[in-house]
Every structure is written in structure tokens, then in C-alpha cells.
């Protein structure tokens, strides 16, 4: 067996002296790259190995209740995507083996059981992922097995887009300008059409196996498909991508309109049912939409460079803000019962579908932090537990952006008025009436002015405002100024 090696296929470099020799048995670990098309790590493994075994590992720290950020919607979507992936691999003559346990223990077990010569996977960049992959590397080194990694998840690898001082950008615009310059953008590969033809399977019984059917019932409270916005899997992803290409031609003009459909691709990108390169290619002329992909890269860079943002403000002085946590107000916010229609519509959409329009995410987040004066960390965790497309880097980045504590964040004194947001982005209250049926027969002007008009609709079962916005805005400014004056 060969010695342990780490490589990045983005640079097509492998420092191992024996890499010209064909590897007999390879093991590819799927994570959030659940497709066999344009999967860099998988294609790398296929090109280097005679036989390629494929696996997925459910880990207790991610899919059980010990994970306080676990989303049942995300886990369900992931398992559906794994079912689709399993079918695709079976059609190619292979088998997707699924396990439950610690990554290093499962890898050690399989190296012995299948006589594995090299382990392949696509790199991830969160603190958890980095430690996980280190543990696999240690096992592989002890067993004299290669580890070969690839960069697949982002347009450009986190940590590679640097400023003139060779440091990570903390502002989006200079990051974006640099990343989209020829010097960097030339490294964005086109999607690959190569096929994997050497999937393998075994007749051996492998320990710690867990079927996807069992995983679905064991690790999730299943949300009926009729309620969710998107279903998992490559086939569903392709349909959504084709629909998005047709519907998003005017994205720059409509993306903030709460009643207009968005791309609905975020979960497919998160779990790799689509490659980021496929999405980039089809929308390459849609500058505003592509810009959103770069925000995703930006937040991945921030988390990679500043891992302390998970659990702490990126800007340390924001840790001194004295939040006014009101448990009852927080409960009303989570249930969509604050008496602020534009806020409640967003939260009800999230609770029902596992998804929320991006503009609604900003509105609801701002309301929690700068109107209810509740810490962004509570909102970050609640969103994480509900979102199908939950991504730690993006979710954390967006919440800290709203709070003012993150990279390139809005200033603390910028506070969204729910009424003005309603006027600007749902003037006819179509979005609100979709998610708050109690208001379906109420005039739009009364909904927009619900803070005063609710007294004229006492027969309506919808909540009256739990607080006075103007008063809370004043308190928010005092709360922040106590730290920053």
C-alpha cells in the first residue's frame, strides 16, 4: 500500500511518488456532493483506481439530538438525495454503502474489510469538517493508505482569494472584485462530462451498515412532501435548474419581490445534487444571481479564516452587547405570531416548508435582533433547525451581517421597519395572505398598517403587535450605543 498523501485536484498536483501506478481498490466518501456527474473527487478516484467502492457515513454528532443545530428538513432532504444517488450508482454496476458511526472508525473497518489502498473525498472547510478529516488522515497514515482530496464545493477554494497583503478579505466587494478578476476566475473549471465506469461492490457483510430507509425513520421526523418546497435528489435538482433558468431571466428586478419565485436551488447546491460549476455555467450571464454564488464563497472564506464566528461575534466588541432576551417574544417570533404580518408570514413559510425567501430572511432576522432585542445566536440556531438548505457558513454570515457583528455587516443603527419592508416588497400583501390566511379578507392597506388598524378588526383571529416598533427601535439604539459610544 502507498503512503499517505493529500492533494488538491484543482491544481492537479499529487506529491506522492507512486501516483502513476494504478491503485487497485479505492474508497470514495460522499458528503455534501451527492451526485456522480461533475464530482471532482469522485472523478479523481475513478481515474486512479481499478475498482471504486462508494460510501456515506451518518455520524452521531451530526444526525442525532446531540447536534443542537440539526435540521430534520435538511436530513430528510439529504437522505432523499442519497436514495437518488444510490440508484444512479446501482445503474452503473456499483453500490452505495451507508453506515452509522465515527468517520475514522468506519474508514479503518473498511480499509481492512475491502483491502482499500486509497481513500478519496472532497474537502470541506468548517471547523468540524477539518477535524473530521484530520482523524481520517491519522487512521490512513497508520494503515499505510493514501488519502487524496479534491476541491469541489465552491467556485474557488476557501483561503485562496487573498488581498495584496496575502490576507483574507473581510469585505465582500473587494473579495468579489478580486475573485471575478481573470487572475482568479480562470481557475473556475467548466463542468466535466466524464463518466465513472469502475464502481465496485462486494459480497461481504459489512459491520455498522444502516439502510437509508432505517436512517429516514431513525434520524428525522418526516415532513410530508406536500408541505416542503423542494425534494431531494439529482433528478429533482435538474428539473429545478431548468425551471430556474426560465424563471430568473429578470432576477435583478424581481429577486426581492416576496411573491415572486426564487431559484429554489439552494438546497441542491448545499448537498451537491448540482455542482457549483453547473449552476455557474447556466447563469454565467446573470450577474446579480452569480453574485449570490460569490456571497456563498465569501462566507465560506470567513468561516475558514475565522472559525470563532460559530458561537461568537466576529467583531469582539459586539460580544459586549447586552441583549434583552424575552422568552415569550422569542416564542411568538418562532411561531409567526408577533402581530407584524410581514415577519410572521416569513416565519410561517419557514415552519411549513423548510424554506424562506431571502428578503424575508433579512426582515425576520432584523426584527428578532433589532426590534425584539434578542441575540442573533438564538435566531441562527432556530433557522439552522428549520432550513432545508442550512449551511453553517452562510447562515452564520447572514445573521452576523444583520446584527452588525460580522464581516461586511450593516451598521448597528440600520434597522428595518417591517411596515416599510411590507410596502416595498409585498405592497399587495399577496405573500402575507398566502401564509397568514387569517388576513386573506383584509385590505392590503390595513395589513400594512396593522400596528394601528388591528383595533378595527377585532373579529380577526390574527395577533395584535407584541411590541411597539418605534419604542423598540429607540431601545435598540441605546443598547448598541452603550457599547459603541
Identify the residue ranges that each predicted region occupies:
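Trp/Phe/Arg-rich N-terminal binding region typifying the photolyase-homology
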Residues: 2-4, 16-187, 348, 394, ...
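A broad detector of short, well-ordered amphipathic alpha-helices
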Residues: 43, 138, 344, 362, ...
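Charge-dense, low-complexity intrinsically disordered segments
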Residues: 68-72, 76, 228-235, 333, ...
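Short clusters of hydrophobic/aromatic residues that line enzyme substrate/ligand-binding pockets
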Residues: 162, 172, 333, 399-401, ...
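Glycine/tryptophan-enriched, flexible segments
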Residues: 166-318, 425-426, 430-485
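Active-site-proximal binding-pocket segments
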Residues: 258-438
Amino acid at each position: 500500500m502507498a503512503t499517505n498523501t493529500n492533494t488538491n485536484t484543482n491544481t492537479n498536483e499529487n506529491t506522492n511518488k507512486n501516483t502513476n501506478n494504478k491503485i487497485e481498490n479505492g474508497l470514495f466518501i460522499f458528503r455534501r456532493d451527492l451526485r456522480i456527474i461533475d464530482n471532482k473527487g469522485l472523478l479523481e478516484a475513478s481515474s486512479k483506481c481499478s475498482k471504486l467502492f462508494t460510501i456515506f457515513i451518518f455520524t452521531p454528532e451530526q444526525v442525532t439530538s446531540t447536534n443542537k443545530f440539526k435540521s430534520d428538513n435538511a436530513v430528510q432532504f439529504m437522505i432523499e438525495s442519497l436514495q437518488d444517488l444510490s440508484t444512479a450508482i446501482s445503474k452503473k454496476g456499483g453500490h452505495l454503502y451507508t453506515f452509522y458511526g465515527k468517520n475514522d472508525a468506519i474508514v479503518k473497518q473498511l480499509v481492512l474489510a475491502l483491502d482499500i489502498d486509497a481513500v478519496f473525498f472532497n474537502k470541506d472547510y468548517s471547523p468540524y469538517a477539518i477535524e473530521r478529516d484530520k482523524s481520517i488522515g491519522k487512521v490512513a497514515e497508520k494503515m499505510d493508505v493514501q488519502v487524496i482530496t479534491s476541491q469541489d464545493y465552491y467556485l474557488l477554494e476557501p483561503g485562496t482569494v487573498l488581498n495584496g497583503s496575502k490576507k483574507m478579505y473581510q469585505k465582500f466587494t473587494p473579495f468579489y472584485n478580486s475573485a471575478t478578476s481573470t487572475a482568479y476566475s480562470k481557475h473556475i473549471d467548466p463542468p466535466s462530462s466524464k463518466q465513472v465506469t469502475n464502481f465496485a461492490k462486494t459480497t461481504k457483510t459489512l459491520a455498522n451498515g444502516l439502510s437509508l430507509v432505517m436512517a429516514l425513520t431513525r434520524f428525522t421526523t418526516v415532513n410530508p412532501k406536500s408541505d416542503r418546497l423542494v425534494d431531494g435528489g439529482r433528478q429533482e435538482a435538474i428539473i429545478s435548474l431548468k425551471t430556474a433558468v426560465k424563471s430568473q431571466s429578470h432576477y435583478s428586478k424581481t429577486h426581492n419581490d416576496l411573491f415572486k419565485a426564487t431559484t429554489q436551488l439552494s438546497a441542491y447546491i448545499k448537498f451537491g445534487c448540482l455542482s457549483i460549476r453547473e449552476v455557474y455555467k447556466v447563469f454565467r450571464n446573470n450577474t446579480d444571481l452569480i453574485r449570490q454564488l460569490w456571497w456563498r464563497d465569501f462566507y465560506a472564506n470567513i468561516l475558514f479564516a475565522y472559525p470563532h464566528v460559530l458561537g461568537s461575534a466576529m467583531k469582539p466588541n459586539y460580544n459586549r452587547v447586552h441583549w434583552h432576551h424575552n422568552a415569550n417574544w422569542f416564542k411568538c417570533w418562532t411561531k409567526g405570531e408577533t402581530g407584524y404580518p410581514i415577519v410572521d408570514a416569513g416565519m410561517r413559510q419557514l415552519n411549513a416548508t423548510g424554506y424562506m425567501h431571502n428578503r424575508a430572511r433579512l426582515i425576520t432576522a432584523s426584527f428578532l435582533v433589532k426590534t425584539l432585542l434578542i441575540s442573533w445566536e438564538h435566531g441562527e440556531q432556530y433557522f439552522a433547525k428549520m432550513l432545508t438548505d442550512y449551511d453553517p457558513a452562510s447562515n452564520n454570515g447572514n445573521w452576523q451581517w444583520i446584527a452588525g457583528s460580522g464581516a461586511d455587516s450593516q451598521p448597528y443603527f440600520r434597522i428595518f421597519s417591517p411596515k416599510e419592508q411590507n410596502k416595498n416588497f409585498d405592497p399587495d400583501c399577496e405573500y402575507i395572505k398566502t401564509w397568514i390566511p387569517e388576513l386573506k379578507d383584509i385590505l392590503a392597506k390595513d395589513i400594512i398598517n396593522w400596528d394601528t388598524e388591528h383595533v378595527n378588526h377585532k373579529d380577526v383571529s390574527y395577533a395584535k403587535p407584541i411590541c411597539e416598533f418605534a419604542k423598540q427601535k429607540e431601545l435598540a439604539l441605546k443598547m448598541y450605543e452603550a457599547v459603541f459610544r
